[in-house]
Amino acid sequence: TSLWSAGFLPGIHQGTQFRAQGDPVLFLSNPPGVQPSDRQRQLSALRSLNDLRARQTLDPAAAVRSSQYDLALRMQSSVPELLALNEESQHTLTQYGASAGQPSFAANCLLARRMIERGVRTVELFDADWDHHASIHTALPRKCREVDRPIAALIRDLRQRGLLQDTLILWISEFGRTPLQQGGTAATAGRDHHKDAFTMWLAGAGVRPGMSLGATDDFGMDIAERPVHVHDLQATVLHLLGLNHEQLTWRYQGRDFRLTDVHGQLLHEILL
């Protein structure tokens, strides 16, 4: 849950997880026999109790609960419409490689576009099965085919709808893979985790297109030119969001924190 938690921010900024199977958002539907009017009365009573608790304890979590319940109530009507991918044209579904009612990374990319259209500020997509310690020669091409088409469709779709200029896209993982074979024969071998050199890409708002920054050695083992630390990336993303990473602080457990700690330099080369 830390991947979409509010972190240092107030709990109202906590992300909402959408699931690929079953109810897309847990506990969003009313239990059997509970009418919308019943739920309204329940929430009104809860709001009174939470407000009383917040005044008594000055606990930020108590103050946030009412807002979270109100958000859940609004989502009961908005989420079904949001998830109705069958409203999209067949041309759009084909562009993404998605099928209505079938969970996939392609469907998630299309869902991301629908969220952005409706004003959702941050969307995070996850894709699994990239940990190729074995059979990388067959597994990696398969994974690339699964993601390449919908990613391209998402960028193209956002541009055509005039949304890309205000949307920052980051494609990123927590590490790369070693350039050396790991285990097995040539046919079944994989690659191990590699934190010392890996790539990511950005597109959209404020990012210079059609360029690369930095390079590895010929083996892909070490950074050979223009190393970029994660704090540099964080500083640049905050800049694109209109925030100065050196001035943005949050008081937590008695001291002020910066999201970039005491580090971070803007990547001016990639900025428009």
Predicted regions and their residues:
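Ligand-binding pockets and gating/stacking loops
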Residues: T1-L272
